[in-house]
Amino acid sequence: VISTLLVAHPWFSPVVLAVLVLGGPVAGRWLYWRPRTAWTVFAASLLPIVLLTLVPTSREVLERCAVSWYLPTFGRVELMANVILFVPPVLLAAVASRRPVVALVGGVVGSAAIEAVQALSPGLGRSCDTNDWLTNSIGAVIGAALAWAAIWAARRWPRRIGTTGRR
């Protein structure tokens, strides 16, 4: 269903990525001062990953693991979707923990773990793919870079003492 939507609307993935790149550091700077909220939103951002990668499907797995190394382009909608999938959780975890490198490693290792589960659990109806790991890892790098920018901005322009952040 999601692949069909993305193929029908090829502009969707680039727009979402642009929103994340432009809005991520701004939202991250705001969340820097609200780590509890950042952790809550981080937990919510894991839901699409679980639903799209670990929920069983009815399809039959024809091959256990596919080995391919294609870089994402705007024309390859599924690859772009895999990139986008990992940007928010890594961004949010990095801002909440104030450790972009740790969040980046978590995203890369988490993606590898998902692919391992898919490879070892044929009953899921999903097959592992090295390209999924690659594109998820690219998304994790983007998320960590955006978090670094947000953390830098929050430290460079700290909120004023005595303000609640509400207007």
What are these regions (language model features)?
Residues 128-133:
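Loop-to-transmembrane alpha-helix initiation sites
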Residues 1-126, 145-167:
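Bulky hydrophobic segments
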